A protein has these predicted regions:
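A cross-family acyltransferase "interaction/gating" segment
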Residues: 93-96, 125-131, 140-184
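Catalytic core of membrane glycerolipid acyltransferases/transacylases, capturing the structured
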Residues: 8-15, 20-25, 29, 36-38, ...
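Short, conserved clusters of charged catalytic residues that mark active-site
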Residues: 29, 66, 115, 147-151
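Short glycine-rich anion-binding loops that position phosphate/pyrophosphate groups of nucleotides
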Residues: 62-64, 135-138
Length: 184
């Protein structure tokens, strides 16, 4: 990841749209390199036709540390922004990169949560898809899904943007919050 730092910094030369799009291309390269280096194979299977010329609200559960690189593999050929928790910006170096590429949400502040929704709508209006984990956090329960927050669904109704559910098969078995990395 640190080898990509100069490329991440390059994205800071541009505005939030172009710079963010560059950042996601770099992250996709990182995802490809990660999967190659670990020997994990990946395949996208669509239940219905996927039109890359349209923007979507992608929704997925978040149950594994492998979910983010998997997202980078799953969403190809279109621009996307992920809704992410603002606390991640406190991580040195990574936090600045994260802030450039994510729509941040402060889950403890209702006003800032509302601003996050407005920011997601802004990107949808710019023809950029958004990725939301409607559980609102990393799922550290024994249940496959936690209760969903309704923000993704309200945004879909308000903007008439289709929701595209994504399922990452076996990521929990490979890199969940309780286990050591396993390639079984």
């Amino acid at each position: 990841m640190f080898l990509l730092l100069p490329f991440f910094l390059y994205s800071f030369l541009f505005d939030e749209i172009k710079g963010g799009n560059i950042l996601y291309k770099i992250c996709r390269f990182w995802g490809d390199a990660f999967f190659f280096a670990t020997g994990i194979s990946h395949r996208n299977i669509y239940e219905e036709e996927h039109d890359r010329s349209k923007q979507y609200i992608f929704v997925s559960n978040h149950i594994s540390y492998l979910d983010i690189p998997m997202m980078m593999k799953a969403i190809r050929g279109q621009h996307v922004r992920i809704l992410g928790k603002s606390e991640m910006t406190r991580v040195p170096i990574f936090g600045s990169i994260y802030k450039k590429g994510a729509v941040l949400v402060d889950r403890e502040n209702a006003g800032k949560r509302l601003q996050s929704i407005k920011n997601l709508i802004y990107f949808l209006n710019k023809k950029i898809s958004v990725f939301i984990c409607p559980e609102g956090t990393f799922n550290m329960t024994n249940q496959p899904l936690k209760n969903f927050y309704d923000g993704a669904f309200k945004i879909a109704i308000q903007t008439q943007t289709p929701i595209k559910p994504i399922l990452f098969l076996d990521t929990y078995d490979r890199l969940n919050y309780r286990s050591i990395f396993s390639l079984n």
